[in-house]
């Protein structure tokens, strides 16, 4: 069996054009990563492709959880986090299936946590300018100013607050009360980062280039951005009123670019 301390969680819904390619790209890396696919009942046969790869080639490093219906990005990741913790992984990654996140950046996020000692590594589009390729300008501006808005309202100094390309050390996910995470859509990304920050975990932004999907259909919608926009007010209120758990060794929250 290929042993690994790291697992990449990939939520999917109708990703048949991308899923085999992204799995093979991750498994081609020198560093050994495992993959957990969380599929929300894709009618296009995404799960069937994963099962074929598990049976024919990757039984010891590729896994899948199939859910019934579209239950939300946040709940997909929380399901994956719990599975990863139960299976004793030390480094737990979030990544999209559509190549908007470059698999070649996974070792860089891993190094930030494993070698440099950070608790959370964020693949950041905005820490060194705007590094987005092939997105419509309206969407670039919406994403960029959404992150600016989160920073302004919460006082949270991460540049890319809505980024979905991350590495967590397991102790972060063991400490955050996953059952209390409120947001199911893309507001989930800001909530997880902000909660880790308030608890006192060390966070590093690693600059990456985000590339718009080459195949398949985007799952973004106005409702997703609405949740993220209005949810920020709740995050700020939580920052004032909520008692966050503290890690024993926590000092001042640290964010490094």
What is the meaning of each model-derived region?
Residues 1-25:
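N-proximal low-complexity "stem/linker" segments adjacent to membrane-targeting elements
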Residues 1-3, 155, 179-257:
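Hydrophobic helical membrane-anchoring modules
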Residues 5-7, 34, 191:
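Cell-envelope/extracellular polymer assembly enzymes that use nucleotide-activated donors
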Residues 10, 32-42, 65-66, 95:
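Short beta-strand/loop segment that forms part of the nucleotide-sugar
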Residues 17-21, 44-53:
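Acidic helix N-cap motif at the loop->helix transition within catalytic regions
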Residues 24-33:
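Short, acidic, metal-binding catalytic loop of nucleotide-sugar glycosyltransferases
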């Amino acid at each position: 069996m290929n042993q690994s301390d790291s697992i990449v969680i990939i939520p999917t819904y109708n990703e048949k054009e991308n899923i085999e390619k992204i799995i093979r790209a991750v498994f081609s890396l020198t560093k050994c990563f495992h993959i957990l696919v969380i599929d929300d009942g894709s009618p296009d046969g995404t799960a069937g492709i994963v099962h074929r790869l598990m049976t024919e080639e990757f039984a010891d490093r590729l896994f899948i959880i199939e859910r019934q219906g579209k239950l939300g990005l946040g709940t997909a990741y929380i399901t994956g986090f719990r599975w990863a913790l139960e299976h004793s992984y030390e480094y737990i990654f979030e990544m999209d299936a559509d190549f908007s996140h470059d698999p070649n950046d996974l070792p860089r996020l891993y190094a930030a946590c494993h070698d440099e000692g950070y608790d959370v590594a964020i693949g950041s589009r905005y820490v060194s300018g705007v590094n987005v390729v092939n997105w419509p300008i309206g969407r670039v501006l919406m994403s960029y100013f959404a992150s600016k808005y989160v920073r302004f309202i919460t006082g949270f100094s991460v540049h890319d607050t809505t980024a979905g390309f991350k590495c967590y050390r397991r102790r972060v996910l063991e400490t955050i009360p996953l059952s209390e995470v409120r947001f199911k859509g893309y507001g989930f990304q800001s909530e997880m980062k902000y909660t880790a920050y308030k608890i006192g975990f060390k966070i590093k932004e690693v600059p990456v280039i985000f590339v718009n999907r080459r195949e398949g259909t985007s799952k973004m919608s106005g409702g997703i951005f609405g949740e993220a926009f209005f949810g920020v007010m709740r995050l700020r209120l939580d920052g004032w009123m909520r008692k966050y758990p503290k890690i024993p060794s926590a000092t001042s929250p640290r964010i490094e670019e």
